[in-house]
């Protein structure tokens, strides 16, 4: 009976996504970051790319977790038709911030759930943001924080970059990387329900350390 609270595998190595799930009351059996080729196809639109990444991650994870519900997420930053990189170095972060300075952009997070029986369920959320004009000093200071490394669009909304944002239209949690309403809806659709960490610990489902 207790398995209904943790009956899924999270296809992500992101500590932030794991923490957000726990805040929402979901505790995956395991978290595994599936490795796939994340190169955009020629002419691929940002929305299509986000959906494809989440789907391919879920399929790869399902191959090794055959009898489990698996859920994956992929966040993509874009400006117009341009897909911005997931920053892997300071130069990527600088490129993204210089490009986004004074501009409106979009963040897509696509969620993909593959059920135990192999059924695919997918939801995608879009949020629009606008950055203020950034000075060279602000960009250099942000580079020194290293917050943008590994982030779509080269920034983390939970850190110093929140001071760059003039407005957000849409889900804030989508910008963080895990839209809450859609996650809850998908997991509940396969019988995975929310529970507190304390209740899980008292039932012996999960180590509360």
Curated annotation (Swiss-Prot):
GO molecular function: nucleoside triphosphate diphosphatase activity
Highest taxon, organism lineage: Bacteria
GO annotations of cellular component type: cytoplasm
Gene3D superfamilies noted in UniProt: 3.90.950.10
Cofactors (names): a divalent metal cation
Subcellular location per the Swiss-Prot or TrEMBL entry: Cytoplasm
Key word Hydrolase present: yes
Active site: 74
Catalyzed reactions per annotation: a ribonucleoside 5'-triphosphate + H2O = a ribonucleoside 5'-phosphate + diphosphate + H(+); a 2'-deoxyribonucleoside 5'-triphosphate + H2O = a 2'-deoxyribonucleoside 5'-phosphate + diphosphate + H(+)
GO biological process: nucleotide metabolic process
Pfam families referenced in this protein's UniProt entry, alphabetically: Maf
PANTHER family recorded: BIFUNCTIONAL DTTP/UTP PYROPHOSPHATASE/METHYLTRANSFERASE PROTEIN-RELATED, BIFUNCTIONAL DTTP_UTP PYROPHOSPHATASE_METHYLTRANSFERASE PROTEIN-RELATED
Entry function: Nucleoside triphosphate pyrophosphatase. May have a dual role in cell division arrest and in preventing the incorporation of modified nucleotides into cellular nucleic acids.
Name recorded for this polypeptide: Nucleoside triphosphate pyrophosphatase
Provenance organism: Neorickettsia sennetsu (strain ATCC VR-367 / Miyayama) (Ehrlichia sennetsu)
